[in-house]
Regions:
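Cell-envelope/extracellular polymer assembly enzymes that use nucleotide-activated donors
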Residues: 134
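Catalytic donor-sugar/metal-binding loop of nucleotide-sugar-dependent glycosyltransferases
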Residues: 103-104, 126-127, 137-154
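Hydrophobic residues within well-ordered alpha-helices
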Residues: 7, 63, 138-141
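Glycine/small-residue-rich loop that forms an oxyanion/phosphate-binding "nest" at active or ligand-binding sites
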Residues: 50
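Conserved dinucleotide-binding and phosphotransfer motif residues
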Residues: 10, 37, 142
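Acceptor/aglycone-binding surface of glycosyltransferases and processive sugar-polymer synthases
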Residues: 13-36, 41, 53-129, 155-179, ...
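Acidic helix N-cap motif at the loop->helix transition within catalytic regions
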Residues: 1-10
Length: 186
């Protein structure tokens, strides 16, 4: 993909990893960079064209207005989830997070999120955290605030999802095991 070239053309700060280390390592590296360079916020944003950059300001405005530690660009604040297999899985994660934390996140699998400085520091010092629903639940249990803003997302503009039916099931099992078992020891 042309993400690197586009970001360079736009004058963005760039961390060019020598190899693909995966989402978690990439995210942790970016969080460390953001903390080291004094950023107040960092936005997680997919490069496949689904996320509309004009909503970044909406996420920042929400964080600044209500002090949210995390703001999720949600597909489902005011729109109901489809009844696809993927959305049924998302509903199950939403329900489990609600049971475990008492708080509802309507779109816990959204990859469009803003993280405030306090959360970035958590990622800086704890390499067991990942940018996935189970970390959102952990942050809620620890008293951090998460809010959501309604956004529109486009169909994928490029690339291919790593999720196929088998990986989707593995993802769901991992999230559920982490939420139900691992987090009790944190």
């Amino acid at each position: 993909d042309r993400t690197l070239a586009i970001c360079k053309d736009l004058g963005c700060d760039i961390i060019d990893m020598p190899i693909n280390c995966g989402l978690t390592v990439g995210f942790q590296t970016a969080a460390r960079y953001a903390v080291d360079h004094g950023y107040d916020y960092m936005v997680q944003f997919d490069a496949d064209g689904q996320h509309c950059p004009e909503y970044i300001k909406v996420l920042v405005d929400r964080a600044q207005s209500d002090g949210s530690d995390i703001v999720i660009g949600s597909r489902f604040v005011s729109v109901r989830k489809d009844k696809t297999l993927r959305m049924i899985g998302s509903r199950m994660i939403t329900g489990l997070i609600k049971i475990l934390t008492g708080k509802r996140i309507s779109d816990p699998t959204s990859g469009f999120r803003l993280f405030g400085r306090d959360i970035l520091k958590k990622y800086y010092y704890d390499n067991t955290l990942n940018p996935e629903p189970e970390s959102l639940a952990l942050f809620l249990k620890q008293g951090y605030s998460i809010s959501e803003v309604q956004v529109k997302m486009r169909e994928r503009q490029g690339g291919e999802s790593y999720l196929n039916p088998v990986r989707s099931m593995q993802y769901m099992v991992r999230v559920f095991v982490t939420l139900l078992v691992v987090q009790w020891f944190r």
